[in-house]
């Protein structure tokens, strides 16, 4: 009987130890899996729809922002391929495509390739203005076939729909220049019945965008708030120009008669993005 009890006790203790080891292994695996998912940097395509009375035909825009000279495959094949699969009518670039500290090769490869395929519109962000010569960035970008907007706009036909696409330099160009550019494009928007789009890098300038006459404002800059925790920090932890717990980091936001679209952007060169995959945004503007 004593021998049986000893065997039983040994077996029970061994079984308990084995269960404990299993739980520890499972916990480690869960932590690794969750960490991998949270830090995954794979490109995501996000779709939004905007309904506007100023449209008679639908128009599809691909929005690319905050690339920061990041590579997405050889010759940017991953990013370009993702855009091609969506068949946009135009590509909108809302700043920081070129980075002031990274080589320009990645930005040039993307701009040159995409401009050969789609009408492409570009405004400079704060990082382009940190380069030695922002005007030189505009010049070589235009030479690649990209339309650079700096207090200017173009009325174009996309899918048989008239659209006015305007843009301003980032306020880093100088506040007086930014004001002059913004007032110029706002006057253009208020004098047309067409669907109006403004490319402007910073989403936090909502006081400027409200009642400026644009149906849609497209921005980036916030990098999705960098660290996002579902249900806890859905807008992210921090964003330039907004500080901690920012409001405008992703998605569509109604600003009275204007809709603000914020992309989380594509940079993955710097600080890790947590629960915050880089994104290509596809916006369907429809009647």
Outline where the language-model segments fall:
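N-terminal membrane-anchoring alpha-helices
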Residues: 1-55
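Beta-strand-turn-beta hairpins that frame and shape the catalytic cleft
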Residues: 51-62, 146, 154-166, 193, ...
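Binuclear metal-dependent hydrolase catalytic cores centered on His/Asp/Glu-rich metal-binding motifs
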Residues: 139, 143-146, 158-199, 206-207, ...
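Structural motif
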Residues: 59, 90, 163, 195-197, ...
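Extended recognition/assembly regions associated with phosphoester-bond processing machinery
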Residues: 46-52, 187-199, 203, 250-251, ...
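Conserved beta-sheet core of the metallophosphoesterase superfamily
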Residues: 203-281
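Catalytic metal-binding/acid-base residues of hydrolase active sites
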Residues: 68, 98, 127-128, 153-154, ...
């Amino acid at each position: 009987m004593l021998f049986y009890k000893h065997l039983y006790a040994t077996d029970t203790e061994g079984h308990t130890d084995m269960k404990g080891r299993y739980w520890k292994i499972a916990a480690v695996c869960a932590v690794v899996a969750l960490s991998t998912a949270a830090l995954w940097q794979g490109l995501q395509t996000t779709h939004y729809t905007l309904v506007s009375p100023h449209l008679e035909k639908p128009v599809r825009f691909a929005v690319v922002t905050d690339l920061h000279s990041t590579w997405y495959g050889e010759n940017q094949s991953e990013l370009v391929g993702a855009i091609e699969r969506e068949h946009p009518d135009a590509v909108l670039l809302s700043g920081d495509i070129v980075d002031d500290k990274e080589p320009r090769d990645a930005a040039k490869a993307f701009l040159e390739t995409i401009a050969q395929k789609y009408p492409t519109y570009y405004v400079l962000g704060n990082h382009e203005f940190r380069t030695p010569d922002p005007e030189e960035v505009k010049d070589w970008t235009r030479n690649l076939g990209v339309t650079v907007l700096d207090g200017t706009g173009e009325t174009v036909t996309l899918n048989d729909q008239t659209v006015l696409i305007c843009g301003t330099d980032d306020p880093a160009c100088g506040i007086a220049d930014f004001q002059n550019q913004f007032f110029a494009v706002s006057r253009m928007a208020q004098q047309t019945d067409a669907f109006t789009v403004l490319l402007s890098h910073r989403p936090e300038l909502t006081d400027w965008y409200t009642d400026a006459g644009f149906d849609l404002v497209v921005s980036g800059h916030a990098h999705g708030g960098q660290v996002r925790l579902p249900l806890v920090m859905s807008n992210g932890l921090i964003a330039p120009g907004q500080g901690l717990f920012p409001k405008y980091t992703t998605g569509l936001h109604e600003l009275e008669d204007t809709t603000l679209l914020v992309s989380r952007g594509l940079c993955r060169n710097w600080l890790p993005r947590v629960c915050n995959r880089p994104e290509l945004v596809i916006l369907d503007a429809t009647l």
